[in-house]
């Protein structure tokens, strides 16, 4: 039975190869969405280490009252983070959102953030966009984040 499953998996990989979302290299069995090389080059911020004192918090402070600001990736035009967001939003790749949420959750776990929140709440998507896209990219990210942190995700916003 195991040999049959391996054959089916190998056959599916031949017809529908799993490639890195950034460099398009073939992924190994232990990789998901990004190859190890591209994952290592992600522009990850250190905002989770200093959520009360970072430049993004300073920028938002003038707009609204903010206690803490966390961000996973630094956004640069035409950079890796923008390419991943475009895959997620415009190329029908919800797994990218889940992957990014899961990775960010793993990073936050190292700083013991799992005890900081009661639940993860995704930002709702306009119903017309949801109908067109078929999924809410924020919800996909929230699913991965909630799973990594071991807390509930709840769709409580409209």
Regions found by a protein language model. Give the residues of each.
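Glycine-rich phosphate/pyrophosphate-handling loop used in enzymes and phosphotransfer proteins
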Residues: 1-158
């Amino acid at each position: 039975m195991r040999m049959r499953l391996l054959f089916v998996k190998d056959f599916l990989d031949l017809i529908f190869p799993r490639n890195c979302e950034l460099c398009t290299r073939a992924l190994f069995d232990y990789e998901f969405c990004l190859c190890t090389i591209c994952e290592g080059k992600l522009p990850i911020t250190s905002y989770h280490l200093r959520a009360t004192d970072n430049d993004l918090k300073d920028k938002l402070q003038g707009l609204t009252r903010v206690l803490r600001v966390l961000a996973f990736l630094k956004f640069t035009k035409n950079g890796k983070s923008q390419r991943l967001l475009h895959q997620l939003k415009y190329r029908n790749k919800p797994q990218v959102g889940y992957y990014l949420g899961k990775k960010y959750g793993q990073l936050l776990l190292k700083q013991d953030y799992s005890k900081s929140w009661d639940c993860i709440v995704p930002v709702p998507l306009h119903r017309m966009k949801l109908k067109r896209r078929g999924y809410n990219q924020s919800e996909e990210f929230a699913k991965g984040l909630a799973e990594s942190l071991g807390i509930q995700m709840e769709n409580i916003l409209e």
